[in-house]
Structure formats: structure tokens, C-alpha cells
From Swiss-Prot:
Cited Pfam families: GDPD
Name listed for the protein in its UniProt record: Uncharacterized protein MG293 homolog
PANTHER family tied to this protein: GLYCEROPHOSPHODIESTER PHOSPHODIESTERASE, CYTOPLASMIC, GLYCEROPHOSPHORYL DIESTER PHOSPHODIESTERASE
GO biological process: lipid metabolic process
InterPro entries in alphabetical order: GP_PDE_dom, PLC-like_Pdiesterase_TIM-brl
Superkingdom of this protein's organism: Bacteria
Lineage: Bacteria, Bacillati, Mycoplasmatota, Mycoplasmoidales, Mycoplasmoidaceae
UniProtKB keywords: Hydrolase
Domain GP-PDE: 5-241
Amino acid sequence: MLKRQLLLAHRGYSDIAPENTQLAFELAFQYRFDGVELDVHLTKDGELVIIHDETTTRTALVDKTIELETLASLKQDDHSAFFKFKTQPQPIMTLKEFFDQYLDKFQLINVEIKTDQKEYPGIEAKIDALAQQYGKKVIEKVVFSSFNFASLQRLYDINPNYQIAFLFWTKKQFQAVDALKIKQVCQYLHPWTNIYEKFPDMVLSLQLPLGLWTLNSEVKFHQFRQDRMVYAQIANKKFEV
């Protein structure tokens, strides 16, 4: 367990910048978040890209499916197009580009492997191959999470030294996976805050540190600050400690 609870910017500082973009990550750094949470998919040509959805429709306002497009194709689009404020154009980032710019800057980074809707065969091996380029830094500074426990198991089987968190937002999702398997593979649980509040005994039954998402209430943020089982809160906003 970390000595001090961390505050991670959800998809970067997404309250004031377009989510999962270089601008959102840069502002998270400038506003002194401890780290960021981001989402990773796999392109047609095997590149790890940072985006939440399986398509670019919502963020770039262009109808492309990540797994059917090359990186070059996806780089043509502006992922600030949807945002409430006009910003400089924000092309999609690769995970490598992010690591090159921010791995040394943040204390902790949460990379969500987005295999809950599409499996992206081989994505875990791609992540491992990229991580190896940075020595021990990824093992020390990155927590990999997913709603798809099989994806976490595959990453663990490749290298059991990765920090891994099981992500869930329903009671059914949590109970669908054997508790002993979760304990073997994961160092953390990342429950939706509402599930933790509704079923605290269930969530705490594994005695794993918690990363809570997504905090939008300052009252709840300070409430969870007092919870010794919470190692990190993931928020769209910057709350003052």
C-alpha cells in the first residue's frame, strides 16, 4: 500500500481538456495530479492507441472503428472536435508517445486495457513488448486494469510482476470471477464508487487496496480520503487536499 493516497486524472484532466489527448495529460501534469488514467485499444496495424471508445465517432466526430483502421488513418482526425471548448487540434496518441512524454513525470499511471467489448487478440503481448523498452519503469509506475479478467490473466501469465487491477461496476461482474484467481493475479481492485458504497463488505472481502472511479463530488472525495483501503481516487476534476 502506498503511504499517501493518490489522485489520478480520469482520461487526463478531462474536465478542462478533451479526454485522452496530449493536452489533457499535459494539463494533468501542470495542475499536479499524481497521475492519470487512460484507455488503450489496438489498431489494424497493431499499434496501441489511447482512446476510450471502440470508434472515433464521439470524440473526433468521424465514423471510424479502431480495429479496422491504421494508425496513419486515425492520426488524420482531431479528437478535440467534440469538446465544449475550442482547442488546438488533438491527434490520437499512441501509448508509446505517452510513455515517452509522461512516464517519468507522473507518480502512477493507470492503463485500462479496453478488451471488454472487443478482445483485440495479442494486445497483452503488444503491451509487454512496449513496456520492456522502458526497463523497470512500467512495472514500477503503471497499474494495468480491465473489465475483462481474462485479459488481466493473460498479462499476468506473460509477466507476473506487472501491477494489475480488476475493474468492475456491477456486483455480477465481481462475483463472476473466482476470488482466489483475483487474489493471485491482482494487487488492486478498481470498483465503481457506487458499488463500493452499496456493497462494501463484498468489495473489501479480498482485502485488496482500492482505486475508486469516477469522483465528481468534493464531499465524496474528502470522505474517501479518510478510507485507508483506498490507494487512489480517479477524478475528472482537481480536488484540493
